[in-house]
């Protein structure tokens, strides 16, 4: 039988969503303020494995590694947004190239 995680009262726990800012500030307790992972997790009321993951992600992002999860540092958030924008612009450029070629082809055929 598979059981879902439960809180102290025995009721099923709801998945909590945390903002990038909350994750970053929580991880900074360990990385910048020398808290232990356990102390930071307790102070921020999150699980130990969650805090460990956030600390690893913050360290990776500060080293310039692109995160697999949603980025938490402002720089990585901006990089992700810029990549999406670049991808959209490249797609629009391809569409314009094809449209131009089609229009040129039509104008050549109609002039004959």
Swiss-Prot record:
Family: Belongs to the transposase 8 family.
Task of the protein: Involved in the transposition of the insertion sequence IS911.
GO biological process: DNA transposition
Keyword terms of this UniProt record: DNA recombination, DNA-binding, Transposable element, Transposition
GO molecular function: DNA binding; transposase activity
InterPro entries, alphabetized: Homeodomain-like_sf, RD_transcriptional_regulator, Transposase_8
PANTHER family: PROTEIN DISTAL ANTENNA, TRANSPOSASE INSN FOR INSERTION SEQUENCE ELEMENT IS911A-RELATED
Provenance organism: Shigella dysenteriae
Name recorded for this polypeptide: Transposase InsN for insertion sequence element IS911
């Amino acid at each position: 039988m598979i059981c879902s995680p439960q809180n102290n009262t025995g009721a099923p726990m709801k998945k909590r969503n945390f903002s990038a800012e909350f994750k970053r500030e929580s991880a900074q307790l360990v990385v910048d303020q020398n808290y232990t992972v356990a102390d930071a997790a307790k102070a921020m009321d999150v699980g130990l494995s969650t805090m460990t993951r956030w600390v690893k992600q913050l360290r990776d992002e500060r080293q310039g590694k692109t995160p697999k999860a949603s980025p938490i540092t402002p720089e990585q958030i901006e990089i992700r947004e810029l990549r999406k924008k670049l991808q959209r612009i490249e797609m629009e450029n391809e569409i314009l190239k094809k449209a131009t070629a089609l229009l040129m082809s039509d104008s050549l055929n109609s002039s004959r």
